[in-house]
Every structure is written in structure tokens, then in C-alpha cells.
Amino acid sequence: MSSPGAESAGKSLQYRVDHLLSAVESELQAGSEKGDPTERELRVGLEDSELWLRFKELTNEMIVTKNGRRMFPVLKVNVSGLDPNAMYSFLLDFVAADNHRWKYVNGEWVPGGKPEPQAPSCVYIHPDSPNFGAHWMKAPVSFSKVKLTNKLNGGGQIMLNSLHKYEPRIHIVRVGGAQRMITSHCFPETQFIAVTAYQNEEITALKIKYNPFAKAFLDAKERSDHKDMMEEPGDSQQSGYSQWGWLIPGTSTLCPPATPHPQFGGPLSLPSTHGCERYPALRNHRPSPYPSPYAHRNNSPTYSDNPSACLSMLQSHDSWPSLGTPAHTSMLPMSHSAGPPTGSSQYPSLWSVSNGTITPGAQPAGMSNGLGAQFFRGSSAHGAPLGHAVPAPSASGSPLYEGAPTATDVPDSQYDASAQARLIASWTPVSPPSM
């Protein structure tokens, strides 16, 4: 005789089991309408066959890596004609489609020799296996998790030889009974060549277009192309700007090169306000101190091939009367021959240059005073003076030069003295225009 407590527990258990059995029955019913207990009408069809055909026309390629790479297009099949109440397992393997090793030459795949020995046969078992026939028929069977590798590392991955053509095969095995039955299906449009990197750009474009997980690859490619476009103008400007680097003030936000340019004795030392660390990634491979975004600066000066015109582009400074002409100069060597001023500057040329020496020229009384002390300054303790003497100012010269004191000293730490190596001797004499 059972106790009332046992009867209550039995009713509670029966209640819980009922809803579980109901869920199982619903699962068994799904897909049963496509079932056939005799299995005489078993059919397996390829999903996305039109997409597979587009890839086949171009000779499809699949990436193989050491850690394994998933396939695209994803292999999916729809199944009908299974016994809804029988148990089945779905398996996938790959067989060689021909007896060639392939190579990509002049935009097409051609046979390239004898194939390598086939790796041990690897079989991928669908993770839903085993399951009822009704389960397999209710929705397309997707092999989205299979990974292709070129290393024998196990883990359910399929090992393939690179540059060999393969064809996937799907096997359906009936399990759970006394008799094992198996049926195999393959689709020629799913053939592909295993590669470690895509060879055909059209295949790459199709993969990016139809694979939602390839959008990151597309974005990375666009960023890379944009970076290349940004670097190209920077590289082309390098040759034109590097020789005028001494015209840039010390407060510039441009970076010195990691390795000095061969024609300079060494990089210029810039003040602590320098913004070099803003572009740390450019220091290891750029010989020019100008990073690629330099072309987008709105306040960038306009450079001219005429050195005389460049001399006149510097801002005026109120300390001109206190400056004199040193016995040597820290101006870097030039690779261009200078001609007469072109008149592109708002100031006339203030210097008369001849045979490697710098001579102050005449300046009108109403002219703005001098050049900033941060330009043309070097350390007299380390620089090698030029062999030419600096002539005295002419009688008609500006009174600003008469009795001018010695040039203002600038700390050695601000500039590297090795940059004041020499001055080219091909300057053309320039006379200031009459006012």
C-alpha cells in the first residue's frame, strides 16, 4: 500500500515528464512530412548551388592554415526521404579531384606536377550526430564548423595539401540498428583548390561580397589602401623638403629622422615642446622628418626652388639690431643652384651671397627688422668655421649693421653643431632692389 506522499510525488513527476515528452514529440514531427520509412526516395540537394557555380567558374579556392580555417561558401545540404524515427549520423570527408598539383600562372590555374602523397583520411562528424531522420530533414544540414588545415593536429580538423584540388563528400550512416547502412553524395560544383593565400583577385572579391564575416578584411584593406595613399605624397615631398629643413623654426611639430640623412652631419636637436612622440610609428622607417599627414596642415609654408626666395620667407623679428653676421654659419648645404629672387615674397632679399660667404646687403630704413635668433644659429664651440672671411658692411649699407655686437649665443643643446658642415659655393650674387 503506497503512502499519500509517494502518490503526490508520482503525480508531480508525471506532470514534469509530460511536457518533456511533448517537446520530444514536436521534434519528431518536424521534418516527418519529408520522411520515407523505406528510404527509397532519399534525396540530398546542395544549398546555394548558384553561388557555388559562380565560384567554380573562376576555380574556387579555400584557405588552409595551421590552426584551421572555415570554408566559404559554407557546405549545406537539404535532405528528404529518411525514416523520421530512425537514427542517422552525417559525416564529411574530402577526396582528391584529380592527379595534379596546381599552380597559378598568368592569371589562371595550370597543372604543375605530380601530386603529393595524400594525408591520412580525415573524417568530420557533424556535431548533431547521431539524430533522428526527422531532425536532419527539418532544416538544411550545415557544415559551417568544419575547419581546413595544412597540419596534422587533430581536433576534428581536415588536413589538406596546399595547391591540390579537392571535392567534398557527404555520407549518411544509419545507426542504432542491427544493420549499418551508408549512402554517399558529392557535388562537382563544390570542388576547390586548397591555398594558403588567395591567388585569384576575383575569388577574393566574391568572398568579400558574399561572406558577412569578410567585412573586417574589406575594412582592413581599405585602411591599408588609404594609408598607402597618405604615404605616397609624403614620400614625394621628402626629396623636395629635406634640403630646406633648416628653414623650419624650432617650435615645429615635425619629427627628426631616426637615422640622419647622409648629406647632413646629424639630426637637429629640437626643444622639449617638439611633437615627435606624436608619430612614433613613423620613426623606424621614414628617412624624412615629415610625416604623411603633413600635406594636410593648413599653415604649412610654401616652399620654392629658389633659395633666395626661401631666405626672405622667414618672419621678421624685433631683435634684428642685436644680430651680427658670425664668422661661420650653420646653414646646411644646398643641392640647387640659386638664381635671382623671383619676387614671390613680400620682402626683398636681405642677403648678398657670393662664393660661400654671406654678406649683409643694404636694407631700406622702413623695412621690418631682422631674422629671428632661432634661425642660422650654431654653436661656435663645435662648428668648423669657413675659410672665407666675412667682408665689412659697405658704406651704403644699413646703419643697423654698424657697430653691431657679436651674434647672440644660443645654447648648444638647441642645435646639433654637426649640421653646420659646409656651404655650397655655387651661389649667384644678389643685390637688393632699390627703394
From Swiss-Prot:
It is found in: Nucleus. One of its GO terms (cellular component) is nucleus. Residues 297-310 have a biased composition (Polar residues). It comes from the Eukaryota. PROSITE patterns: TBOX_1, TBOX_2, TBOX_3. Its main location: nucleus. Monomer. Binds DNA as a monomer. This is T-box transcription factor T. It comes from Canis lupus familiaris (Dog). The lineage of its organism: Eukaryota, Metazoa, Chordata, Craniata, Vertebrata.
